[in-house]
Amino acid sequence: MNYPAEPFRIKSVETVSMIPRDERLKKMQEAGYNTFLLNSKDIYIDLLTDSGTNAMSDKQWAGMMMGDEAYAGSENFYHLERTVQELFGFKHIVPTHQGRGAENLLSQLAIKPGQYVAGNMYFTTTRYHQEKNGAVFVDIVRDEAHDAGLNIAFKGDIDLKKLQKLIDEKGAENIAYICLAVTVNLAGGQPVSMANMRAVRELTEAHGIKVFYDATRCVENAYFIKEQEQGFENKSIAEIVHEMFSYADGCTMSGKKDCLVNIGGFLCMNDDEMFSSAKELVVVYEGMPSYGGLAGRDMEAMAIGLREAMQYEYIEHRVKQVRYLGDKLKAAGVPIVEPVGGHAVFLDARRFCEHLTQDEFPAQSLAASIYVETGVRSMERGIISAGRNNVTGEHHRPKLETVRLTIPRRVYTYAHMDVVADGIIKLYQHKEDIRGLKFIYEPKQLRFFTARFDYI
């Protein structure tokens, strides 16, 4: 495997340091064994998320100085609008403070209580907004996506038979829309093939069902299509992205990922009537339709960053840096979700902590142990993130119980990946010492963000 060098020069740095293990243990206890509640100053390598943790380019920082902070009609909005229209092909764009704001708008605009939203695996905040507006989420991802050890391409594809069955049983009129994530975060960052997007479009169009993409990591998805799908090897990333969105009615976007910024998002659509309603609604929750809760400078940085993300040298390095970490862990026998996705390496906590049951929260405990032993912050993605069933109150029990090692864009080097891998490999050698956890505080909504735990 050829791992390309960083396609950039580092112009500005932030000093970090490793605090002693006994201090890390104390900090973890104070945080209730929840890595979200740690203070960033106490973290050596922060792999909690790739959301908003990117390093911006010199051109983006220059653009920040050109912020038009008019309350209405900011020139930076029009730059962002033109950029998104050109690269994605959608007719309308509504800016939001981040992806969650776009999810909120779409859910209110598209869902009637009692309807269904089908998608290729749930995501935490997305499903929350869907359920909050009265929908029932139905997972129609291919079964292989739930098998951590199965190494096949495009595990994020929608199962067309499942989709057809849902249409037959519930009726097309009762399906609000299809939520197609590119890539599928909780499956390990797995991509969706262009063939599957095209087939989903054909099936839904025949039944009058809308398709909205979660476009957060669309550039990473495009890279996998170029790398692995026949007929796309000679197409540019921008060409692939444009074709991807030609099979959708709109999308939600968190700019904090593939737009290479620290804040921002947007909602896209082609429907004029929906756009008119969205402009009315965004004023209530975000701000004027020409800023959506963002400063002009942030919209400018987002427009520049989205275009930079289309550069092949950037996205090749980004994906292969993640793959480098995964390959090193796999070579040492550490169980990971395969194949390695575009934004993170997911440890398979079921196999890593096979002595713990799912009710002992193995992924949560593993994430806490990784911080204590290595100074690296990661994130639980298992039963805690899945939450509870709104009707029964029982835990959702995902087949995948993982810890996500999420790589920020243009922030860390291969040397950092070596440190992460070496620490986790060492921890794996005494994995039996990892103990189960229990709740001592469980929030009612999106509990993984602020819950607290203690050892059983």
Curated annotation (Swiss-Prot):
Main enzyme class: lyase
N6-(pyridoxal phosphate)lysine: residues carrying this PTM: 257
Single annotated GO MF: tyrosine phenol-lyase activity
DNA-binding among keywords: no
InterPro entries in UniProt: ArAA_b-elim_lyase/Thr_aldolase, Beta-eliminating_lyase, PyrdxlP-dep_Trfase, PyrdxlP-dep_Trfase_major, PyrdxlP-dep_Trfase_small, Tryptophanase_CS, Tyr_phenol_ly
Keywords: Lyase, Pyridoxal phosphate
Assembly information from the UniProt record: Homotetramer.
Cofactor: pyridoxal 5'-phosphate
Taxonomic classification: Bacteria, Pseudomonadati, Pseudomonadota, Gammaproteobacteria, Enterobacterales
Reaction(s) catalysed by this chain's protein: L-tyrosine + H2O = phenol + pyruvate + NH4(+)
Family that this chain belongs to: Belongs to the beta-eliminating lyase family.
Protein's UniProt name: Tyrosine phenol-lyase
GO biological process: tyrosine metabolic process
Pfam families: Beta_elim_lyase (PF01212)
UniProt keyword Lyase present: yes
